[in-house]
Amino acid sequence: MENKELETNIPESEIAADAAVETPAFDDAAQKEKEEQAREAKIAADKLLPPDPDALLEVRHLKKHFILKKTLMGKPLSTLKAVDDVSFTVKPGETLGIVGESGCGKTTMGRTILKLHQPTDGQIFFEGKDIAGYSPKEMRALRTKMQIVFQDPYSSLPPRSTVGGILAEPVKVHNIVPKAEVKDYVLQIMEQCGLRDYYYERYPHEFSGGQRQRICIARALTVDPKLVVCDEPVSALDVSIQAQIINLLKKIQEERNLTYLFISHDLSVVKYISDKIGVMYLGSMVEFGEKDEIFDNPMHPYTNALFSAVPNPNPDEKVQRIILKGDIPSPANPPMGCKFHTRCPRAMEICKHIAPEYKEYGKGHFVACHACEQES
């Protein structure tokens, strides 16, 4: 029996018309202007809302942009959007883990929250007060409540000061205890961080990386903070030492009811220590939620790709690796529409032109993805 091609009597003009309907034309300039107007309207509306009474830290539409080039008249010509419209809340005693590839804006966001960088726009509520517009003098009074542990323990300690001098300085500056009690107070903090008393007179170069990071943690604790930003605190350490530092951070959190903003690219570490997880890509939060919800039900394609890269210790359980094609676009020139569409395996035509809305798909589970929106 001969194979015959199916014939159709539908005019070509009608086929072309149907194709035009299925693939709508986008005016990128008009669409971009429309998106900006909608975003500004939402930001203006959210600014009128009261802060979350249960949150220690609440971030709304936070932006940090760096001007790369200016015209002769001083007008910005090129801008790097390191942090672009990020929102989340953290309750007292919780740990929020922030994950993403290098260059996604994790560290910049953490430093902007502490106002080590001045925010370009947005609100930062700490204990119910918006500190985004605080002056350096006003922030000085808050430094005892907000501290940071830096990534590199080798460069974050002054080499000419002893451990005792390093830890005693913030205690004296902020008048934490009377001068006569400073040394005893510092020794107590050192003991809590697993540091021997005789380390008090030693210098940073005499210690290993793990011991130096313990000193950095002790320095943050000397002023009795409520929020500690941990900026990849174990990435420069050996794996065996990493476990010790993570366990130390958890022990101290339980003893002092600390709140952590834990920045890392190691998903196994984040899963162990975090209560909530935020996933960032090119300066934006693409997914946010409770730890168990994010790991059990990752919705954003980028989150799925990150999780598929984690080695599985069970050799009998095969995990399909999701390989992202292409390089990460430049934050100074991000793609139009969804920033992830150039690498996304589920990208659609709409993703190239319209940025997805960051919306809630379950209790506390926020995602910014057109594919998730169509499936819901």
Predicted regions and their residues:
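Conserved ABC transporter NBD signature motif
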Residues: 122-130, 142
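Helix-to-loop junction immediately C-terminal to a conserved catalytic motif
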Residues: 114
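A short, proline-enriched helix->beta-strand linker immediately N-terminal to the Walker B motif
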Residues: 222-226
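P-loop NTP-binding/switch modules centered on Walker-like glycine-rich loops
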Residues: 229, 233-237, 241-319
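Conserved ABC ATPase signature
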Residues: 203-207, 211
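Short catalytic/signature loops enriched in Gly
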Residues: 39-55, 68-74, 79, 290-376
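Conserved ABC ATPase "signature" region
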Residues: 130, 180-198, 307
